[in-house]
């Protein structure tokens, strides 16, 4: 999604990767771009005909206005500041901000984590409004999903979710039946649940 916004609309995209390093995320993006497994890219075990594809993919991604910040424990204020700086450098509004993932963000007070997440989601909503940019904040699910017969996620499954559903304009949840049932006839199908 982030790559498409940068590529198709030529708008700067800011990705805050709190879980993965910049290098890991770049390998994933490159893997998607060229259709070669990320592990093979990392090890360099490519077929002769794949090397030119790799070069083209690196060139394509290198031209995109994408910024990846992989500093752990970032907070809303740091993210807002970085987004403003990126907008000033690029001379235009951002096309998208992606945060991977919400529960790894640092709060500004020692309150309980649910209250902290509530402050963070309100801050992200304010940042989106102030900078006029869509913000996609990925979130973890609680382990409760695993104990149910029907594993499709619900709003109540969002970890520390007190305010996520309240502050979000839209919550999308992803479900792949083959993850839980390898023999399912729905192999290769991903459901997007809109709540």
Question: Model-flagged regions — what are they?
Answer:
Residues 18, 46, 101-102, 140-141, ...:
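Short, ordered loop/turn segments at secondary-structure junctions
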Residues 85, 93-137:
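Helical hairpin unit composed of two closely spaced alpha helices linked by a short loop
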Residues 24-25, 104-108, 144-147:
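Short acidic/His/Gly/Ser-rich catalytic and metal-binding motifs that mark active-site loops
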Residues 116-195:
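Phosphate-binding/switch region of NTP-binding enzymes
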Residues 21-25, 37, 46, 50-57, ...:
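Helical mechanochemical/support elements of P-loop NTPase systems and associated helical scaffolds
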Residues 4-93, 107:
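Cytosolic-facing regulatory segments adjacent to core modules
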Residues 8-13, 63, 94, 99-102, ...:
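Active-site lining segments that contact anionic ligands and/or coordinate catalytic metals
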Residues 1:
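N-terminal cationic and glycine-rich segments that engage phosphates or anionic surfaces
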